[in-house]
Amino acid sequence: MLMVWILVSYWYMKYVEVVIYPPRNLGEKNMGAGLTAYFKSEFSNWGKGETIWLFSASAVILGLSLYWGDSLLGIIAALTGVWCVVLTGMGKSVCFVFGIVNVLCYAYISYGAKYYGEVMLNTLYYFPMNFVGLYIWNKHTNKETGEVDKRHLTNKKRLIIALGSIVAIVIYGVILKHMGGNLPYIDSLTTILSITAQILTLYRVAEQWILWMVVNAATIFMWGVNFAQGNENIAVLLMWMVYFLNAVFMYYRWSKEAKNNEI
C-alpha cells in the first residue's frame, strides 16, 4: 500500500497540478486544492443514464454480495471494478484510480481460485498500465467536455489485431496448461484479449469494447464455474456481468462519437 501511495502521489504532483491545473506560482502550489479541482472535474457533467447505471449496478452488487455472505475483499474488488469500467466508458481519467485498487484485490482473489493467468495479468500488466493510462488520458482530455477524445480503427488494423491475438491465445494456453491452471485456454483467452483491449483503451479507440465483450463473456463462464464449485465469489461474478453489459452500452456510445475519427 505504501508503494501505491508513493506512485499515486508522484503522478499527482507531476501531472495533475502541473499539467491539468498549473498553479500561478509553482513555488506556492496547493496540493489539496489541485486534487480537489481534479476530482471535481472528473465527477461533474455526468449523463443521467450513466449515473443511474453506475449507482444501480453498485447497489445490486453490494446487496447480493451481502446476502450471499461474500468476503469484504470481493465486494471491494467488485465495486471498484464497476466504477472503473463505467468511468472508462464515460471517458474520465479517474477510472484508472479505481482500477489500481481493483487489480490488487482481484489478483489476490484470482490466486486463491488458481486462475494464474488472471493473477499475472493484473499484477504484472494492469497495475503498471493504470499509471500509464492516467498520464495518457490526462494529456488527451477535451477541456470542454471533460472526456477523452474517441477514435476507431481501420479494417486493416482490426484484421492484424485479430490474427495476432489468436496465435498468442493458443501459445499462452499451452503454457498455462503445463502450469496446472484451471481452464487454461479460457484463462489464456481472457488474458491475451485483456492485454490487447487495454492497449486499445490507452489509444482511446472504440474497438476496445468489442474485445471487452469477449473477455467479459469468457470470464463470466470462468467465475461461474468457480461459484458452482462452492466458492464464495458471487461479487466477482456479478462484477463481470456488469462489465459485459457496460461494454455493450459503451461500444454503441464510443462508435457513435468516434465515427469521423479513424486511425
Features from the language model and the residues they span:
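Short, hydrophobic transmembrane alpha-helix segments
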Residues: 61-72, 90-91
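Hydrophobic core of alpha-helical transmembrane segments in multi-pass integral membrane proteins
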Residues: 52-65, 158-175, 244-247
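Short, Lys/Arg-rich, polar N-terminal cytosolic tail immediately upstream
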Residues: 23-44
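N-terminal membrane topogenic signal
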Residues: 39-54, 154-159
